[in-house]
């Protein structure tokens, strides 16, 4: 199954990592979503790429310095907990890519995934090898993926972490890299492609998924073969 991943939802059209953004991605044809998780001052799992609210919500406040109640108030309830996303969106997509922005709360994330019975739908991804190693120590079966831009030996690192996915910045991955990954039983999801031309190019290179801010680009790919839809 080819993964059409809504990057932070459909952030080209809605505010990133909000319910509106995730639902828009699904409406536009995404069969997977990607989101980012941080932890609040009171230990709640918050869906946000940045640790500061300024860029998205215009408030110069760090998530790690605020409680969930304070964050909800400052964002007019638009900021979400991971629990809210999993309960609302979890059964409406084939996969949810949960990016750990920091290490130290892997157990909380896994507990919530198990609580919502979404173990088969989640891929935990991160730039942080220590976070992925901790996830694997805690759960031998859940899928994980190593995110990277430039990396000398990503396949070796992913295999050492017992990960199933490589999640590279698309500009730094080539057809031969994808073929090598597949030979090592690793799947490849590239980020972030917003051009129809580039999406076609990387599908031709045999990637297993594309993360995009514009999930509607997949609808325009009339040359996608049936087994890649």
Which residue ranges define each predicted feature?
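Conserved SAM-binding loop
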Residues: 14, 98, 124-125, 190-192, ...
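Non-membrane alpha-helical structural segments and their capping/turn regions in soluble enzymes
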Residues: 15-19, 79, 83, 103, ...
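Alpha-to-beta junction loops
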Residues: 30-31, 140, 206-209
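C-terminal active-site rim and adjoining tail of enzyme catalytic domains
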Residues: 72-79, 146-229
